[in-house]
Amino acid sequence: MPDSLSFAHSAERNALRRELRARRRALPAAARIAGADALATRLFALPFFPAKGYVAGYWAMDGEIGLHSWQLRLPPGLVYCLPVLADDETLRFAPWRPGDELVTNRYGIPEPDVDPRASLTATDM
């Protein structure tokens, strides 16, 4: 039987998620684009930002801040990866570029159309 405290916490968390999604959706497109550009600028300014290898991002959904501005400006030696959910719920990563095929996973999230076993683990990144 679920613990009543954890159930209350879960209900509060779900309510907060709904509220934040509504706030994100209410932002005008210009504000979302400006936010994405500002985030990209800040990411590139990080002192530990890599020049080569892999970086993981996400497919922005439901008002989340987009990473496209950042992804399109990555240095040539840096490969952008999106999460791929394996059948065992393990999160893996696969290289992705605009135009590459995407499929919708069981949660409705677009991910690269690859066999999850052929994708990268977090430690491979």
Q: Which residue stretches match the model-derived regions?
A:
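Short SAM/SAH-binding signature in class I
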Residues: 123-125
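N-terminal active-site beta-alpha-beta segment that forms phosphate/nucleotide-binding
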Residues: 2-121
